């Protein structure tokens, strides 16, 4: 965990690489988070290497694998892993306190089917995840880049959709969620023209929140205030 990369996007939506040496100033760790990283990383942490993971070796079994991009503090990811022990889960997060919090929660919950990267998701997907190996890819509440001039910096772009499609098995699902309606519309525009996908919504728009995605405290509060959340699920069909 000595170096972390972050992805940036230019105005055409192309990925740029910005490598920086990791320093603790980039995120203050609580004692609990630091201790969790120290004690749990050897068993749950995945050190980035530009070679495809052997998932059966990593998890000690063969099982369908779910990958989440940007899990934040990790509470929902840990809950999903706890509620679906038959699945393998991989989480990717560049924010170190989030990694520490996730590992702490996972250890407290006794979760054994979760592995975590502290690295840029684009590099992990491009180099460390084999094509056709994932059952589901999750992208929940990504940065909306709400200013119009920044929309092309949003992670959901045609190139990204194709990358996710390659990593999914046939029949695998790309599940997105956002609390910005404009971003949900952007996601639909991108995904509806992306080759090899089928929208799982009956009317070609969004889907109700599926049972596998936990309702977060933030989201529940938003519902009470009349705020919306939009879920999109696209199946790989080719």
From Swiss-Prot:
GO terms for molecular function: tRNA (guanine(46)-N7)-methyltransferase activity. Pfam families: Methyltransf_4. SUPFAM superfamilies: S-adenosyl-L-methionine-dependent methyltransferases. S-adenosyl-L-methionine binds at residues 68, 93, 120, 143. The keyword Cell membrane does not apply. GO terms for cellular component: tRNA methyltransferase complex. It catalyses: guanosine(46) in tRNA + S-adenosyl-L-methionine = N(7)-methylguanosine(46) in tRNA + S-adenosyl-L-homocysteine. The keyword Transferase applies. Its EC number is 2.1.1.33. Pathway: tRNA modification; N(7)-methylguanine-tRNA biosynthesis. Substrate binds at residues 147, 179, 216-219. Catalyzes the formation of N(7)-methylguanine at position 46 (m7G46) in tRNA. Belongs to the class I-like SAM-binding methyltransferase superfamily. TrmB family. This is tRNA (guanine-N(7)-)-methyltransferase.
